[in-house]
A protein has these predicted regions:
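N-terminal ligand-binding lobe of clamshell/alpha-beta domains
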Residues: 1-265
Length: 265
């Protein structure tokens, strides 16, 4: 069977394809996709690297179609119209829109099937579940501190989607947004009333380039401020499992004090 020609229009999909060992099938990606650690990207189709087709919300669809993909990968409700536009051009689109942690993990298997690597997808999902089980064991029967997670700061927005699940999986409480609900602007007074034990900042598009001191200066914040790379919590990719592990270590450092600093739970 010939390896499919894959165009990924979502950084999270690209990261998942790479984790599946299928980056060699990518013939096109967005300007925001990171394949810097995957030298094999595009190699199954004799190209040095996948073609950049533009932004993740405004890619050049003529360029996408010109790559003659067998499947185009999209993700998130913000790309639903884009997925429809690709279908109108006769392209086969695999659009995935996870909103909870369970759906993200299940999506690894689905993505494997999307790119012709179903067994790899099942393995990746199983590995993610095992990691979550290890975290659950490590934080079991411990007090659950409250965390406030902010994915945008002007105005302040409490993270939603899978982040509430991630905090709970890490052994914390998250009273700001229900699992599966979209991120939303938060009332500073509500955050103050919740009296979080930790503030976690992961601003979209900023990586880890946020000054925690600027957040700590707010008169409604009275807790340690932690800055995480936004890819650890904002994307439904395998990096989200790294994010859950980081959260668990922030919320329960004593649970991991015996293991090495870089060891998984």
């Amino acid at each position: 069977m010939t390896d499919p020609r894959v165009v990924s229009l979502a950084p999270s999909a690209t990261a998942t394809v790479a984790a599946l060992g299928a980056a060699d099938r990518l013939v096109g990606v967005t300007n925001h996709c990171d394949l810097s650690d995957d030298a094999d990207a595009g190699s199954a189709h004799g190209i040095g690297s996948p073609t950049a087709v533009g932004g993740w919300l405004n890619p050049d669809l003529d360029r996408v179609a010109g790559l003659d993909p067998d499947v185009v990968l999209t993700s998130d409700g913000l790309q639903a119209d884009l997925a429809d536009a690709c279908r109108e051009r006769g392209l086969d689109v695999a659009h995935r829109e996870p909103s909870t942690l369970d759906e993200v993990v299940e999506g690894f298997a689905t993505r494997g099937a999307d790119v012709g690597r179903p067994e790899a997808g099942e393995r990746l999902a199983a590995d993610a579940r095992e990691r979550l089980d290890r975290i659950a064991d490590a934080v079991a029967d411990r007090p659950r501190p409250t965390a406030y997670c902010e994915e945008w700061s002007d105005p302040p927005m409490a993270a939603g989607n899978w982040v509430p699940d991630a905090v709970r999986a890490a052994g914390g409480r998250y009273p700001f947004v229900e699992p599966g609900e979209r991120s939303r602007e938060v009332d500073p007074a509500a955050v103050e009333r919740a009296d979080p034990d930790h503030v976690v900042v992961h601003v979209c598009g900023h990586g880890d380039r946020v000054d925690p001191a600027a957040v700590a200066e707010r008169d409604w914040v009275d807790a340690p401020v932690h800055v995480l790379d936004d890819s650890l919590l904002n994307q439904p990719s395998p990096a989200l499992l790294d994010g859950v592990e980081r959260l668990a270590r922030l919320l329960h450092p004593e649970a991991f004090s015996v293991a090495g600093a870089d060891d998984r739970p």
